[in-house]
Amino acid sequence: MVYSYTEKKRIRKDFGTRPQVLDIPYLLSIQLDSFEKFIEQDPEGQYGLEAAFRSVFPIQSYNGNSELQYVSYRLGEPVFDVKECQIRGVTYSKPLRVKLRLVIFDKDAPAGTVKDIKEQEVYMGEIPLMTENGTFVINGTERVIVSQLHRSPGVFFDSDKGKTHSSGKVLYNARIIPYRGSWLDFEFDPKDNLYVRIDRRRKLPASIILRVLGKTSAEILDIFFEKVNFEVKDQTLMMELVPERLRGETATFDIEADGKVYVEKGRRVTARHIRQLEKDGVNFIEVPVEYIVGKVSAKDYVNEATGELIITANQEISLEALANLSQAGYKKLEVLFTNDLDHGPFMSETLRVDSTTDRISALVEIYRMMRPGEPPTKEAAESLFESLFFSAERYDLSTVGRMKFNSSIGREDAEEQGTLDEVDIIEVMKKLISIRNGKGEVDDIDHLGNRRIRSVGEMAENQFRVGLVRVERAVKERLSLGDLDNVMPQDLINAKPISAAVKEFFGSSQLSQFMDQNNPLSEVTHKRRISALGPGGLTRERAGFEVRDVHVTHYGRLCPIETPEGPNIGLINSLSAFARCNEYGFLETPYRRVVNGVVTDEVDYLSAIEEGQFVIAQANAKLTEEGGFADELVTARQKGESGLHPREHVDYMDVATNQVVSIAASLIPFLEHDDANRALMGANMQRQAVPTLRSEKPLVGTGIERNVAVDSGVTAVAKRGGVIQSVDASRIVVKVNEEELIPGEAGIDIYNLTKYTRSNQNTCINQRPCVMPGEPVARGDVLADGPSTDLGELALGQNMRIAFMPWNGYNFEDSILVSERVVQDDRFTTIHIQELSCVARDTKLGAEEITADIPNVGEAALSKLDESGIVYIGAEVKGGDILVGKVTPKGETQLTPEEKLLRAIFGEKASDVKDTSLRVPNSVAGTVIDVQVFTRDGVEKDKRALEIEQMQLKEAKKDLTEEFQILEGGLLARVRSVLLAGGYTEAKLSSIERKKWLEQTLENEELQNQLEQLAEQYDELKADFDKKFEAKRRKITQGDDLAPGVLKIVKVYLAVKRRIQPGDKMAGRHGNKGVISKINPVEDMPYDENGQPVDIVLNPLGVPSRMNIGQILEVHLGLAAKGIGDKINQMIKEQQELAKLREFLQKVYDLGDTRQRVDISELSDEDVRTLAHNLRAGLPVATPVFDGAPESSIKAMLELADLPASGQLTLFDGRTGDAFERPVTVGYMYMLKLNHLVDDKMHARSTGSYSLVTQQPLGGKAQFGGQRFGEMEVWALEAYGAAYTLQEMLTVKSDDVNGRTKMYKNIVDGNHAMEPGMPESFNVLLKEIRSLGINIELEDE
C-alpha cells in the first residue's frame, strides 16, 4: 500500500474486508461540472450560454428588413478575487461580452440582398462565477445553488387509483410534459369517454385534437379500431371470422361451418374451441341478421343513385338501415370490432359527445377554451393551435423529453425534434386506450427514471434565456422603428433585463441558499443536496406520502437515511457516495460487471431505467479467490426486489458497501447496528457540530474522513509535489519537483492560509500548517489543516472517556454529566466570530458623522475608541460598550422655557445631534480582532482608514516582495546550475554579484540559449511583480463602491470564546443527543482502579429503546484503540528498541486485516518513530459502513491492549471511594458539541417594544420579547386561586397601557402599588364585534 506523506504520519487501521474497486469520486463534481458546462464555449451549441444565445438569435424585425445575429461571446476577467469580494460585500463575477452582427437588407432589391453589415461587441451584464469549492459569492456572502429533482419531460401514463369518482372506478390519464411549453393531458371520465385538456384548462372531447389534425370521423375510427367484415351471400349474412376474437365470449347462436357445430348456443368459447376453428381453417360463419343490429358502422355508406347518406360512420346499424343498404346494392359491410374485455368502444363513444364536425369548428372550440371571451377568427384560431405544440419557439420537449417520449411510445425516428407531431399525439392516445383495455402498465412517477436532476448550470442557463427573451421583444421593436443607418448593435441591446434575471436567480431564488458553513461536512453536504422543492417543483403542502418515501430506485443514487426531520422530510435528499448525473440529468450509480460468473473490476454506471433489466448482487456477497460467487444462491436485486438468484444469473455487483448511503451517513461507524431513525439524526447532527479549538481525529472512524476533509476545500492541498521550503502561520512555500515543472517557470508554489475568518454561521475558519520545512510532499497531500480537520482527516468533535451508568439523576432523560476536566482542558471550547457594522448615511438634515465626540457620554464609555471614534483592535468589550461612535443630525426642536433660560445665561447652543453609535449587543462579550473601514469615493478618509490602508499596503508589498524573492531565488539557482555546467567555478561565481550572473556569456550555444531564456524570465518576473503591486495598490487606495446614500461603513469583528457549560447540546454520531445538566468536579467523577476518572457519564437507558447499539460497539472499540495507544506510549517512555516497537505495531495492524496490508518493514526508522509518536493518544481505526469490525476483532483488540474482553471495568465512586456494585461499560466515544449553545438561547426581557394592535409585548429573542402567558397558564393560576398574580399578568405585565406606565412611575418613586386598568385586547374585542355591525358600549359605574 502506498501512503501519502500525511497519511504515513498516522495510518488508520482498517477493518474493511471488501476490496476497494472504485475510489469515492470528487464530492463536489455535481456542482463544478454543471457550472463548467454552462460557462464553457460549446461549439455544438447544446449547453450553456451558447445554447441560450442560439435559441434566441437571430432576432428579425417585424417587417423583415433587418436582423440581429449572434456571432460569439467571451467572458472577461473578474475585478476582485474571491477574498476581496467577501470583504467588500460584492459579487464575484465576470463581465459577459457578446459579439453581435446587425444585418440590414435592401428593401428595393430582391429578397435577401444585404445592404449593410455592422459588427460590434456588446456588454451584456455580469455572470456570477463559481469558486473552486462550488459556491458563489453574492454580495459578499457565500451561497450554494441546490440541485433540483423535478419530473422529467416526456409522456406519463397514470391513473387516479379510483380516488376521483365515488364508484371507485379507476380512471386512466396521460400527460405530455414538455421542458417548456403547454401541458397536454388526455383523460378518461367515469363514462369511459376520452377527453383532452390543454394547460389544465376545461376539458374537451379528445377527438377535437384529431379533427384539428385534419382527420374525419371515418379516419379516426380507422386509427383506433379493428374492423369486422360482414357479407350478404345467398340471402344469408356471413361474418368474417378471426377465431382469437371469440375468446371469452358466450355464443348467442350455434357457431357452425360446413354443417359441423363448433360451439353450441349459450356456451362459453374456450381456447379448445378456438384451436379447433383455427385447425379447420374456418374463415366465414353464418350469423343471424339480429346479430349485426347495434354494431357500429366503420364508414359512411352513400346511395350512389340518389346521393343520400344511408348510414354515417360511427352510427349504430338497425334492421331498417340494413335493408336500405342491400337495396342500394351494398353486399359488404365494415363494422367496428369491440367487446367488453379488451377492445372497449371508447373512441367511438367519444365521437358521439363531440359537437364539432370539421377542422374549423374544432379549432374554434379550442380557441374558445384557451381565450374565453375573445371573438374567434379562423387565422387567430389557426395560429394559436400552431403555436401551442408545433412551434419550436413556444414548445420544446428537450433532448431528454424526446428520449423519454420515444422510449415510452416505442418510436424510433424524430430523435432531434423538440415539438410534437401528429404521430406523437395519436400514439399517446393509442397507448392510453390500450392501458384502459388492460394491456400495459401505468408509470411510476416516483421512479428515478421519471425524475431528473436540474443542476446549477441548467438553471442559470434557463434564467439567462428568460432575460434574453425579454431583451428580444425590445430589440424587435427598435429594429422596426425605421432609420437603422446609424444604429449600432449596442444601441439595440439593453443589458439591464439580462443582468436582472441572473441577479434575481442567484440572489433570491428558493434554490439559491445561504451556505451552511458550520463545518466541512455541512459544506459538502449542502452542495450535494437534492431538493424536490423550488420553482417548477413540489410544494410542502401538496407533496404526499409517496413522493417523500424511499423508492427502490434510490438504491445507490439518493441516500435513504439523510433527510431533514419535519415538514421537508423526504423532499430534500442527499446524493449517495458514488452517484453521479448522466448527460440527460438522470442519476447513475456504479456496478462491477460480472462476466461468465466472474466478478471483474470493470465498472459500469447504470441509471434507474437501465438497472431494471439486470440482476445485481450486493457488495458483501461472498467471493472465491478467482472472483466467482462462493454460494450457489446469491442475494441479489432485480427490478428493485431482493431475493435469492442462482449465481449464473447475476449480471452486476455493487462496488462498495457504502454505495447506498450519503457521505454524512458513511461517517457513522457501525451504522449497520443503528436503527434508521437514529441514524438519520446522527447524520444530520454531524452537520451541526461546531469546530473545536483543537480538532481531534476520531479514534473510531469509517475511513472516508480524509476524502471529506480534502474535497471540502477547507484544507490546503498540494497542487504539485515537491519539498517544503518554508512554513509560517500564514504561508507555506513548496519547491516543486523537477519532473512536475512547466518549462521556463521558477518552480515555487506559494500557499497563503486563511487566518481567523468568520464563516456564514459565525464559527471560526482558521488554517494551520501540518508540515515542517524539508519534508517531501506529493501532489494531493494535505499541507495545512482547516477547521474541524486533523492531519487531513475530518475531525468534528473530541474522543471522550465515557461510562454508561446513572449518576444521582443528573443523567435523567438524556442529560449528560460532564467532568470539570473537560472544561479545564478546553476540549469543547469554540471560537465564534461576529461581524457588527456601522453605516454612516447622508440624511435630509445633513450627513451622519463617525467621531469620538458624542454628546452626553462619559469618558469611561469612550476609553476604548481612538481619535476617529473607532474601537482599537484587541479591546475586550462587553454588552453595551460603544464600538463606533456616530452622531446623526436631528431636526430643530421646540425648546422648553428652562432650556431657553439656560441658553440665555450660558449662551451655548444646545447640541443638535443625537447619539446613534454602534454598541455591542447585550448578550455578547468578546475581543475585537479586526476593523475595516470602507469610504465612499470622493469622501475624505479619516485617520483610522488611512492607517488601515497603510498597513494593508505594507502587508501587500511584504507578501509580494517575499514571493518575488522566493521566485528569484529559485530562478537564480537554475542560472547557477547552467553557469556551473558552462565551465564557471564555485569560486568565480561567488566573486560575481548574483544579479550580474545573467549577463555572463558562455561558449556552449545551448547553455547560452538557456541562460538568455532565464534572463528573459527574470525580466518578466520583475515586470510581473511591479504590475501586481500596482494593481494591489490601486485596489487598496481607491474609494469603495457603496450603496446610494452611504458615506462610510465600519465593520468590527468580535471573537467570542465559548466554553462548554450546562445547557449546551452535545451528541454522539448515532443520534444520541442530550443536554449538559451539570459540570462535576473531577474528584467526584467515577474512576477505575488505575485512578483514571471518566470524562462523561451517560444514561444506559438511552440505548435499548432507541436501538442505536452502534454507540456501544464504538465505545468498546474506542477503549481498545486507546489501550493500544497507551501501550505504545509506555514502550516509547521505557525507550524500548525499535525492533520491538515495529513488531508490536505489525501485530496491531495485522489483527483482523484483510485488505489494508500494512507492512511496517517498508517504513524507515524515522517514519516508524513519527507513526508511534502520533499513535500515543490512541490507534485510529476505520470500520466502514456495512463492512465494520466484527465482535471477534473488537475482543481481540481489547485483549491485545490487556483490557477485559467484556469492555467493562470496575468503577469507584469519586465521592466515597466505594466500588460500584457491578462492572460498568467504559470506553471512548466521539462526542460533538452542536451549534445550539445556551448563550445564544437564554434571554430575559425587562421592558421593550409592544405589538401595535394588541399592545402586548413581542415574542422571541430577536425582538427582545417576553414569555407568552397563554390560555393554559391562566387556567393554572385560576386553579390555584391566585387572583392578584393573575390580574397582574393580564393587565400591567401585558397590555394595560396606562396601568403599565403608572406602574413604572410608581416603581421609580419607590411606591410598589399597582393600579390596573382596561387591557387593550378588550378594546380590540369591542372593535371586532363592532365590525360585525353590533354596537357595544361600556357603561361607567
UniProtKB/Swiss-Prot annotation:
Nucleotidyltransferase as UniProt keyword: yes
GO molecular function, one term: ribonucleoside binding
Taxonomic superkingdom: Bacteria
An example Gene Ontology biological process: DNA-templated transcription
Coiled coil: none
E.C. number: 2.7.7.6
InterPro entries membership: DNA-dir_RNA_pol_bsu_ext_1_sf, DNA-dir_RNA_pol_bsu_external_1, DNA-dir_RNA_pol_su2, DNA-dir_RNAP_su2_dom, DNA-dir_RNAP_su2_hyb_sf, RNA_pol_bsu_bac, RNA_pol_bsu_CS, RNA_pol_bsu_protrusion
Gene Ontology CC: one annotated term: DNA-directed RNA polymerase complex
Reaction catalysed by this enzyme: RNA(n) + a ribonucleoside 5'-triphosphate = RNA(n+1) + diphosphate
Keywords, sorted A to Z: DNA-directed RNA polymerase, Nucleotidyltransferase, Transcription, Transferase
Subunit structure comment from the entry: The RNAP catalytic core consists of 2 alpha, 1 beta, 1 beta' and 1 omega subunit. When a sigma factor is associated with the core the holoenzyme is formed, which can initiate transcription.
Described purpose of this protein according to its UniProt entry: DNA-dependent RNA polymerase catalyzes the transcription of DNA into RNA using the four ribonucleoside triphosphates as substrates.
Protein family: Belongs to the RNA polymerase beta chain family.
Protein name: DNA-directed RNA polymerase subunit beta
Species, as recorded: Vibrio cholerae serotype O1 (strain ATCC 39541 / Classical Ogawa 395 / O395)
